[in-house]
């Protein structure tokens, strides 16, 4: 069967036990499928597979038409942030724990990926967040940090401090001042992550929206809210010491009073390839253990 792809980048969770052997077997499989295989530079330095070249993100974007990610959702998120701007599609093999985005079990990767490489797959596009931190400088604001996030942007209180007070504006319209342990702005992809544990709803990845979820708010009436994803959200630090902001766990600590975190939709989208027949609801059932102990097809005991 002819390959739909030509050159695959292989990205691995190199800290995991046995990762070198796992990555070597995936690389050999891809090569046997007729693909040229390169490792991303970080993976190559960590595992040392000399038979394969090493490419950085820009080189992957230029030379590769597929990226195969072996690891958990954290590895997948990091790769997605790096490669989304280049439009390289991702296939995720789960070597982690939950694996919402890395949906191919390690034990089944050969029989699952072979037809995908030949072009038999489902393609999904995931929205990304683009965020920056602005600091007051006279009458202006200087951008001191900017990056992308696939899951969420989280503003949190300091480790030794009490609650933070955050002013939130959406599309330059004042929403409220929140006193809480923090605030999550989540994409639909991130709605099954921190936002879910903080009491937010699950959003289908096809929904054009964000979640805004307070973390342990002082007022119980402060509830999660769904926002249109063409909105720019601005969060200002009003009170609280040592607050921090995390973009998919990329952290900027020691925010100051008056700092603003601005979040909007990125122009880039993450291309994710799934096996034929994949659907979001089956993933939820499997990962969240829904329907366990329930008789199938409405049967009665």
Swiss-Prot record:
Question: Which cellular component terms (GO) are annotated to the entry?
Answer: cytoplasm
Reactions catalysed = NAD(+) + ATP = ADP + NADP(+) + H(+)
Key word 4Fe-4S present? no
Cofactors demanded by this protein: a divalent metal cation
Which GO molecular-function terms appear in the entry? Answer: ATP binding; metal ion binding; NAD binding; NAD+ kinase activity
User: Which Pfam families does the annotation name?
Assistant: NAD_kinase, NAD_kinase_C
Q: Which keywords appear in this protein's UniProt record, sorted alphabetically?
A: ATP-binding, Cytoplasm, Kinase, NAD, NADP, Nucleotide-binding, Transferase
* Active-site residue list: 73 (proton acceptor)
Q: Where in the cell is it found?
A: Cytoplasm
The UniProt entry lists the main location of this chain as: cytoplasm
What residues does NAD(+) bind to? 73-74, 151-152, 179, 181, 192-197, 216, 250
Q: Keyword Iron-sulfur, does the record have it? A: no
Tell me which Gene3D superfamilies the record gives.
Answer: Probable inorganic polyphosphate/atp-NAD kinase, domain 1, Probable inorganic polyphosphate/atp-NAD kinase, domain 2
Q: Which GO terms describe its biological process?
A: NAD metabolic process; NADP biosynthetic process
What family is it from?
A: Belongs to the NAD kinase family.
Identify the NCBIfam families for this entry: PRK02155.1
What is this protein for, i.e. what is its function? Involved in the regulation of the intracellular balance of NAD and NADP, and is a key enzyme in the biosynthesis of NADP. Catalyzes specifically the phosphorylation on 2'-hydroxyl of the adenosine moiety of NAD to yield NADP.
Q: Under what name is this protein listed?
A: NAD kinase
Question: What organism, scientifically named, is this protein from?
Answer: Methylibium petroleiphilum (strain ATCC BAA-1232 / LMG 22953 / PM1)
Organism lineage reads as: Bacteria, Pseudomonadati, Pseudomonadota, Betaproteobacteria, Burkholderiales
- Encoding gene per record: nadK
């Amino acid at each position: 069967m002819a390959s739909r792809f030509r050159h695959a980048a292989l990205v691995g969770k190199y800290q995991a036990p046995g990762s070198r052997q796992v990555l070597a077997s995936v690389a050999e499989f891809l090569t046997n499928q007729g693909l040229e295989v390169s490792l991303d530079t970080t993976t190559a330095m960590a595992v040392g597979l000399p038979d394969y070249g090493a490419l950085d993100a820009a080189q992957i974007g230029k030379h590769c038409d597929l990226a195969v990610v072996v690891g958990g959702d954290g590895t997948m998120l990091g790769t997605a942030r790096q490669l989304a701007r280049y439009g390289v599609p991702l296939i995720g093999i789960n070597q982690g724990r939950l694996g919402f985005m890395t949906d191919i079990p390690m034990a089944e990767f050969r029989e699952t990926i072979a037809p995908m490489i030949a072009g038999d797959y489902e393609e999904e596009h995931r929205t990304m967040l683009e965020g920056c931190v602005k600091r007051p400088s006279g009458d202006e604001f200087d951008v001191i940090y900017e990056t992308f996030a696939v899951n969420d942007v989280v503003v949190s209180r300091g480790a030794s401090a009490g609650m933070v007070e955050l002013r939130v504006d959406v599309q330059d319209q004042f929403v409220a001042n929140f006193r809480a342990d923090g605030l999550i702005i989540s994409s639909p992809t991130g709605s099954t992550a921190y936002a879910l544990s903080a009491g937010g709803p699950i959003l289908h990845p096809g929904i054009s929206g964000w979640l805004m979820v307070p973390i342990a708010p002082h007022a119980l009436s402060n509830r999660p809210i769904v926002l249109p994803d063409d909105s720019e959200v601005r969060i200002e630090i009003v009170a609280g010491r040592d607050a921090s902001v995390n973009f998919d766990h990329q952290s900027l600590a020691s925010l100051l009073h008056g700092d603003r975190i601005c979040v909007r939709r990125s122009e880039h989208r993450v291309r994710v390839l799934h096996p034929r027949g994949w659907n979001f609801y089956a993933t939820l059932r499997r990962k969240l253990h829904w329907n366990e102990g329930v008789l199938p097809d409405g049967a009665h005991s």
